From Swiss-Prot:
Keyword RNA-binding in record: no
Family note: Belongs to the UFM1 family.
Keywords, ordered alphabetically: Isopeptide bond, Ubl conjugation pathway
Organism: Brugia malayi (Filarial nematode worm)
Protein name: Ubiquitin-fold modifier 1
Cross-link type Glycyl lysine isopeptide (Gly-Lys) (interchain with K-? in acceptor proteins), residue numbers: 87
Role of this protein: Ubiquitin-like modifier protein which binds to a number of as yet unidentified target proteins.
Lineage summary: Eukaryota, Metazoa, Ecdysozoa, Nematoda, Chromadorea
CDD domains listed in its UniProt record: Ubl_UFM1
Record-level GO cellular component terms: cytoplasm; nucleus
Proregion span(s): 88-90
Pfam families: Ufm1
């Protein structure tokens, strides 16, 4: 009997676009979240190197975890933002 691989689904919204488009991505729980970030950025045609993912509450997410851990800690609704808006203060 094959072991079923658990998947998690994220709804990622692009906050830099006024229309707030979103993508729904389903990935295996063990997927590195850096790969999810990169794929989401490519789907929205924004540079992954200058993008970050935050929660709907504005909490930054460290992408060096598995997708399963991110899902358990932060849920399924996330936001993709340009990194120049992270922690910026005048």
């Amino acid at each position: 009997m094959e072991h079923a691989v658990g998947k998690v689904t994220f709804k990622i919204t692009l906050t830099s676009d006024p229309k707030l488009p979103f993508k729904v991505l389903s990935v295996p729980e063990s997927t590195p979240f850096t790969a999810v970030l990169k794929f989401a950025a490519e789907e929205f045609k924004v540079p992954a190197a200058t993008s970050a993912i935050i929660t709907n509450d504005g909490v930054g997410i460290n992408p060096t975890q598995s997708a399963g851990n991110i899902f358990l800690k932060h849920g399924s609704e996330l936001r993709l933002i340009p990194r120049d808006r992270v922690g910026y203060c005048e």
